[in-house]
């Protein structure tokens, strides 16, 4: 599975966890069915293990928004992206930013992709 697809599947799993209060294992199983992808699982597990710290990074960059007011797709995608930016050294920040914007265009809307871009641009230095 390509990393873009792994990110999309991770977003879907994180969304299920957030919306349905589903367990991490059940969400991964629902999304992946009989497939397995180590990167997708690393993303979901990493976001959930570091959720409080990730949210603490996101919240001050929301510019007059509260994290609990964000729609669940945007919140899940922001968490996923911040995890990649802050915890994974092998993913350049520019790649994570671009992937997030493109995925937002698919699963959310143009306004959300611009919002996500703005939040992540405040969080991620482009030189990593």
Swiss-Prot record:
The entry's keywords: RNA-binding, Transcription, Transcription antitermination, Transcription regulation
Disulfide bonds: none
GO CC terms: cytosol
GO MF: RNA binding
Biological process according to GO: DNA-templated transcription termination; transcription antitermination
InterPro entries: NusB-like_sf, NusB_fam, NusB_RsmB_TIM44
Family: Belongs to the NusB family.
Protein's job: Involved in transcription antitermination. Required for transcription of ribosomal RNA (rRNA) genes. Binds specifically to the boxA antiterminator sequence of the ribosomal RNA (rrn) operons.
Protein name: Transcription antitermination protein NusB
Species this protein is from: Listeria innocua serovar 6a (strain ATCC BAA-680 / CLIP 11262)
Recorded name of the encoding gene: nusB
